[in-house]
A protein has these predicted regions:
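Long, aromatic- and glycine/proline-rich binding clefts that accommodate carbohydrate-like moieties
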Residues: 29, 327-343, 387-446, 476
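Extracytoplasmic "Venus flytrap"/periplasmic binding protein-like
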Residues: 57-136, 174-175, 303, 319-322, ...
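Glycine-centered hinge/linker elements that transmit conformational signals in sensory
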Residues: 196-205, 237-286, 328
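Extracytoplasmic/periplasmic substrate-recognition and gating elements
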Residues: 150, 170, 277-281, 319-391, ...
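Hinge/lid segment of periplasmic solute-binding proteins
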Residues: 25-35, 102-163, 328-333, 340-343, ...
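Short, well-ordered beta-strand elements
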Residues: 37-48, 68-73, 96-97, 153
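Short, polar/charged alpha-helical segment
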Residues: 27-32, 49-69, 165, 169, ...
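Extracytoplasmic "Venus flytrap"
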Residues: 28-29, 35-57, 78, 160, ...
């Protein structure tokens, strides 16, 4: 024991700066948290890989360092929203921090649900951590700033793109390559156009007819908003239809009034997407983002658009995935001109998803929660969190040796996100997000099950969206 203590002492002498910094850091958290010893803060989030890491790792570590207990509820996407919004509306203070998905933040800001983090820390310097620096975050942080003041309203905890995943083992198999060439006259490679993607999907659906293998995933639940999101945020942009087809100035949705929701491009996109169901596994019409990830991990699809938060575990975790070492990553296929528009900053090719933790005004433990949000916003906790959840919210994380090593195992997913993340975009800054979703989604569901044609679905959806926007006062 004495030898061990002496060794540690020598280490601290030789690395004095490091030791004093680490001890000072520990001391700061303990000192800052002293007034809140024994307090319990409660948070809620969707049960994602990144959230589970908070629940299982970061929450307990924070408690150990500060004495503040963290109760974290990781639940379903719909329950997360339902519980958090009802709590904030009723001002009951059940939750001290809530998950704010990128696409709902504008609604929360419009309804004044959230505490201004920048102002709160400026007003109480005793709980402002020197290790919490907003400038360390990627530009994804901008989605969680008040557009008027520029103040931070949420601390990013996950951010990822939705790339095109494909089975490298199938695409690289010489026998399959020959069969594809004989069948189609083309070389088998990741699709860059929608025509190529459909051709590959059809080929693998036929090839895998007796192998429990289909040609593509489709996030087409006929009763869940996941279908709305896949179409409007992942598929429609690849056809040049942005911001759900709603004009950001006039709030027109119909083509007749200057919108794009029922434009020729939008109709081509929906027909393409619905047509892919012919080559997708039977669970596709009941698949949300979770089931799509499960389908791909089970080896039931040759390709698909899969949320990046699942990329790491699908490619590396043998306890949950049957395709470890077999996953390729690429950009989604697009229509002519769309990639060029995205590179010029005039469009985008898919969804840049993610979220932050924010503090409701209804919270009864705001200061303790501010400490926790800063704790998860330290550079030092980012790398292992990224390994667990395929999420990166700070530029420095990309260069960490652990991430560089894992990047090789996930076919360059992190490199793709770093270099081409600018080609993706979050949801449009609409405070009426939920209302339009509710009136438009039913028409997408009807197209999925074949109750109405895709063209008719979008005509009716655009009309319904405009009517709702008139009702809400956005459009006259």
């Amino acid at each position: 024991m004495n030898s061990f203590i002496k060794a540690v002492g020598v280490g601290c002498l030789s690395l004095g700066l490091w030791c004093s910094t680490a001890l000072a850091q520990d001391s700061w958290w303990k000192t800052a948290a002293q007034p809140y010893q024994g307090a319990t803060i409660r948070g809620i989030s969707e049960s994602t890989p990144a959230s589970k890491y908070v629940e299982q790792v970061l929450g307990p570590k924070f408690t150990q360092e500060t004495g503040i207990k963290v109760e974290f509820e990781a639940t379903s996407w719909d329950q997360m929203y339902d519980k958090a919004i009802k709590d904030m509306e009723a001002n009951t203070g059940i939750y001290d921090f809530v998950y704010i998905e990128q696409d709902i933040v504008y609604t929360y800001l419009a309804r004044n649900f959230l505490v201004d983090i920048t102002k709160s820390l400026a007003d109480n310097a005793k709980i402002a951590s020197p290790d919490f620096k907003p400038e360390n975050f990627t530009t994804f942080l901008n989605y969680f700033k008040d557009p008027k003041s520029g103040d931070v309203m949420g601390v990013p905890m996950e951010a990822f793109i939705k790339p095109y995943l494909y089975r490298k083992d199938l695409f690289d198999d010489p026998a399959i390559q020959k069969a594809y060439k004989d069948k189609t006259g083309a070389d088998l490679k990741p699709a860059t156009t929608h025509e190529e993607y459909t051709r590959i999907a059809k080929f693998f659906a036929e090839y895998g007819a007796d192998k429990e293998l289909w040609g593509t995933t489709v996030q087409a639940s006929s009763s869940h908003p996941a279908a709305f999101y896949e179409f409007f945020e992942s598929v429609a942009p690849t056809f040049g239809v942005y911001n759900w087809g709603i004009d950001g100035k006039t709030f027109a949705a119909t083509e007749a009034h200057g919108g794009q929701m029922n434009s020729a491009a939008a109709k081509k996109a929906l027909n393409y997407w619905v047509d892919l169901l012919k080559y997708a596994p039977p669970e596709s019409t009941s698949s949300t983002w979770d089931e799509v990830a499960g389908t791909f991990a089970a080896g039931r699809a040759a390709q698909g658009l899969v949320y990046g938060e699942n990329a790491a575990w699908i490619a590396t975790d043998e306890s949950k995935s049957t395709v470890v070492g077999k996953v390729g990553v690429a950009l989604p296929p697009v229509e002519a001109g769309v990639m060029e528009a995205a590179k010029a900053g005039k469009g985008y090719i898919g969804y840049y998803d993610g979220g932050a933790f924010g503090i409701p005004h209804s919270s009864k433990n705001k200061d303790a929660s501010l400490l926790f949000l800063q704790y998860i916003g330290q550079t030092s906790v980012q790398t292992d969190w990224a390994l667990a959840g395929s999420r990166i919210v700070m530029n420095s994380t990309y260069d960490d040796p652990k991430i560089v090593e894992q990047d090789k195992k996930v076919s360059g997913y992190y490199t793709l996100m770093r270099d081409d993340g600018k080609l993706f975009a979050g949801a449009p800054p609409f405070p009426f997000h939920a209302q339009v979703l509710q009136v438009v989604a039913p028409f997408i569901y009807k197209a999925i099950v074949g109750e109405i044609k895709p063209d008719d679905a979008l005509d009716q959806a655009a009309t319904a969206a405009e009517a709702e926007l008139v009702k809400l006062g956005y459009r006259k």
